[in-house]
A protein has these predicted regions:
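Alpha-helical segment proximal to the catalytic Tyr-Lys
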Residues: 128, 171-175, 236
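Conserved glycine-rich cofactor-binding loop
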Residues: 8, 15-16
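A glycine/serine/threonine-rich, flexible loop-to-helix segment
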Residues: 175, 187-212, 222, 252
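Residue(s) in the substrate-gating loop at a strand-loop-helix junction
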Residues: 142
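Short C-terminal tail/terminal secondary-structure segment
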Residues: 147, 228, 239-252
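Substrate-binding pocket helix/loop in short-chain dehydrogenase/reductase
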Residues: 99-100, 107-112, 204, 208
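Active-site helix of classical SDR
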Residues: 123, 158
Length: 252
């Protein structure tokens, strides 16, 4: 408890799934949390209520991370509410399973605008609030960045790009006392995975479980606990890394 006491954290895409779990785990550890959402105000408000009902501090802020003006407003609201920023979690994601014949220009931009441009914009904005004290960035990537999935060429490519950004920026931002790491979740049960076609009993789920040594799909809290570790001083000498949290599926 209190590993993140008095820290201020922005978690993008935090109205459900992994992002919601990270926001709630951060709050339990003492962080003040900005629960970002793009469209699901109801979900974000629910996360905030769960946090505040337990004595934590959180606010919900709408922003589409692929839009520069929205990102600027997100961090202006953060500064207005808490005056500073210590932790950024880039969790907002767009994902579709599409065979190559169905990949459109629009689908390309949807994936890359949210999954690659979004983190670039939020990182730029966060650096201004980190200031001289430095900060901590966690990018939620995917094991698909190392082991691309069939019918997921766009999604896999965006996550590979995000890992490259993590590595490059670790070398650039270390002198500013900013740590940056990626978490690579395995097959995790989330609303997003379900909407992408990974449903209970589906062939995708059977494939994932068959290739996971621990024999189950992950839960959002499995990822959230790793995020707490990376956000805390326990990980003070860790930067530029890709941490696989996959039940052994993505061992590398």
């Amino acid at each position: 408890m209190n590993k993140l006491k008095n820290k201020v954290a922005v978690v993008t895409g935090a109205s459900k799934g992994i992002g919601a779990s990270i926001a709630k785990h951060f709050a339990v550890e003492g962080a003040k949390v900005i629960v970002n959402y793009a469209t699901s105000k109801e979900g974000a408000d629910k996360v905030v209520k769960e946090i505040t009902d337990k004595g934590g501090t959180a606010i919900a802020v709408q922003a589409d991370v692929s839009k520069e003006a929205d990102v600027i407003r997100l961090f202006e609201e953060t500064k207005k509410a808490f005056g500073t920023l210590d932790i950024l979690v880039n969790n907002a994601v767009f994902q579709q399973f599409l065979p190559i014949e169905q990949v459109s220009v629009a689908a390309f931009h949807q994936h890359f605008d949210v999954n690659v441009l979004g983190p670039i914009l939020t990182i730029q904005a966060s650096l201004k609030l980190f200031g001289d004290k430095g900060g901590n960035i966690i990018n939620i990537s995917s094991g698909a960045s190392k082991y691309p999935l069939p019918s997921a060429s766009l999604y896999s490519a965006t996550k590979a790009a995000l890992d490259a950004i993590t590595i490059s920026l670790s070398k650039e931002l270390g002198v500013k006392n900013v740590r940056i790491n990626s978490i690579l979740p395995g097959a995790t049960e989330t609303e997003g995975a379900t909407s992408a076609g990974v449903t209970s009993g589906s062939e995708y789920e059977k494939m994932f479980i068959a290739n996971t040594p621990l024999g189950r799909r992950g839960q959002p809290e499995d990822i959230a606990k790793a995020a707490v570790f990376l956000a805390s001083d326990d990980a003070a000498w860790i930067t530029g890394e890709q941490i696989s949290v996959s039940g052994g599926m993505y061992g590398f």
